[in-house]
Every structure is written in structure tokens, then in C-alpha cells.
Design a protein with these regions (language model features):
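Detector for small/aliphatic-rich hydrophobic stretches
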Residues: 1-18
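The conserved Walker
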Residues: 43
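Pre-Walker A (P-loop) beta-loop-beta motif of ABC nucleotide-binding domains
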Residues: 33-34
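Hydrophobic positions on the alpha1 helix immediately C-terminal to the Walker A/P-loop
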Residues: 50, 54
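Gly/Ala-rich phosphate-binding loop of Rossmann-like dinucleotide-binding domains
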Residues: 59
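Conserved inter-motif catalytic segment of the P-loop NTP-binding fold
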Residues: 4-6, 21, 26-27, 63, ...
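Short hydrophobic/aromatic beta-strand immediately N-terminal to the Walker A/P-loop
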Residues: 37-40, 77
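Conserved glycine(s) of the Walker
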Residues: 46-47
Length: 169
């Protein structure tokens, strides 16, 4: 097609270069190595359980959900805002027991601060420092609604909120 400065360049789909995507996985076929994302779903559909299973899998190099292999094992850091620390401990212990793991041997860390607000500069700074110290492979912050006071329906607000997290907070 001739070059025309008034139009955008186009090419037939069949003429596009064929190249398989080069994805690096943290958890094969489930979560990308440098991914920042949200586990979404209806209330009470086990989103928190999935996130915690992912964290335990990364920390222990055991398959997530018994199926998805961990490609980059390492420490995991979690903040579960809706659960008491004893409840978090009990959940992790139950997952460990199911997998035959010793909880004391895991690089699974829990933020014990009662509240974390990603829309506050001080909390962002403290999270950045924690991430720099622990260098986790996976950070789980659950649930998003308890981590800010912004408009969840505003893509701009949520993007500003998650951008520092994606950069290692």
C-alpha cells in the first residue's frame, strides 16, 4: 500500500509477522512474572483463598491449586485486611497441612499492620521499604476495597493507586 501521510499505516492480517508471545510466568498459565492484577469475582467465591494459595505456592514451589507449577519460587508477602492475624495463621497452617509443608520453613510473610492505605503517601513509603527489604516474588493485598478511599469505578483513580505497587511500591 502506498504511503499516505493523511492515513494510518495498515497491513492485511495474513501478512502480519507470526511470532509466539514470549511470556515469563510466576505461576505457569496463571500469573505473569511481573504481573500486577486483580483477582475479581462475585462475593464469597474464594478470591482470597486463591490469592493465599498463590502466595503459598510461590513461597513453597508447590503447584497452585494442585495444578499450576511455580516457575519462579521465592518469598511471598500478604496483607489480608478482612481477617484477624490468628485467622490468617490458621488458614496458612491448613493449606500447609494439606500440602505436607512445615509453616516454619516457608518464606511466606504477613503484614501485621492493622490497616494499610495505598492512597496515603506514608503507607506507600512503608510498603516500598518493606518490599525492598523482603524482595518478595509475590505481593498479595486483599481486598482492594479496604486499601483506599478512592472511587473504585474510576480507572484513573485505580491506576494511580496500583501504579506504585507495580513499580515495587
Amino acid at each position: 500500500m502506498a504511503v499516505n501521510l493523511d492515513t494510518l499505516p495498515v497491513q492485511r492480517a495474513a501478512e502480519l509477522e507470526v511470532q509466539p508471545p514470549q511470556l515469563s510466568w510466576l505461576i505457569q498459565d496463571l500469573w505473569g512474572l511481573a504481573a500486577v492484577g486483580i483477582i475479581g469475582g462475585a462475593p464469597k467465591c474464594c478470591k482470597s483463598f486463591l490469592g493465599l494459595d498463590m502466595a503459598l505456592s510461590v513461597a513453597s514451589a508447590t503447584p497452585c491449586l494442585g495444578r499450576f507449577t511455580v516457575q519462579a519460587q521465592g518469598p511471598a508477602l500478604v496483607f489480608l485486611a478482612e481477617d484477624s492475624l490468628p485467622a490468617v495463621r490458621a488458614r496458612i497452617a491448613a493449606l500447609c497441612a494439606h500440602r505436607g509443608l512445615d509453616i516454619a520453613q516457608l518464606g511466606l510473610f504477613v503484614i501485621t499492620e492493622p490497616a494499610l492505605r495505598l492512597d496515603l503517601e506514608r503507607d506507600q513509603q512503608r510498603l516500598r521499604a518493606t518490599l525492598a527489604a523482603l524482595r518478595p516474588r509475590l505481593l498479595l493485598l486483599d481486598p482492594l476495597v479496604r486499601l483506599h478511599r478512592l472511587d473504585e469505578n474510576s480507572a484513573a483513580d485505580i491506576s494511580r493507586l496500583l501504579c506504585p505497587v507495580g513499580k515495587g511500591a
